[in-house]
Amino acid sequence: MSRVAKAPVAIPAGVEVTLNEQTITVKGTKGSLTRVINADVSVVVENNEIKCSSVEGVKTNAQAGTARALINNMVVGVTAGFEKKLQLIGVGYRAKIAGKGVDLTLGFSHPLVHELPDGVTAVCPSQTEIVLSGTDKQLVGQVAAEIRGYRPPEPYKGKGVRYADEQVRRKEAKKK
């Protein structure tokens, strides 16, 4: 069995877990998440713990570890939630919340409007910062990557949209 799958997922107080064949639903204070688990993985809920194990074979051990990590992210998401912080570095780069989306000015001839999916909320503490939050870790990360993809940080001046904890590798300008 995978080393990750050996550790059970603890169910904190206030979280309700429902298992229906291969579908697991986790409900908490921040909302509810549902996911279909691979058929090669058996999931058991007992004693306020969720245990994942592979049905048979070496190839399914990795699936058991993946299922355990996904279930753990669901439990953390409905209790604490996830957030990603983005910084806009560059002259005239701004962001503001516009209805159900984020209005971005990133040096193009037109402003960009990125529509936010259900389950993700955005806050702009300043014009050059965006904080995305939600219960689904994958969805929050995907939206952050899409916004970063409009203008990734460039290596010469460091301008662009970057994650708050991202270190941009800088290059030296060409010398004559």
From Swiss-Prot:
Keyword Acyltransferase: no
Record's keyword terms, sorted: Ribonucleoprotein, Ribosomal protein, RNA-binding, rRNA-binding
One GO term describing the cellular component: cytosolic large ribosomal subunit
Biological process annotations from GO: cytoplasmic translation
Signal peptide residues on this chain, from the entry's feature table: none
Entry annotated with the keyword rRNA-binding: yes
Taxonomic superkingdom: Bacteria
Function: This protein binds to the 23S rRNA, and is important in its secondary structure. It is located near the subunit interface in the base of the L7/L12 stalk, and near the tRNA binding site of the peptidyltransferase center.
Family: Belongs to the universal ribosomal protein uL6 family.
Name of the protein in question: Large ribosomal subunit protein uL6
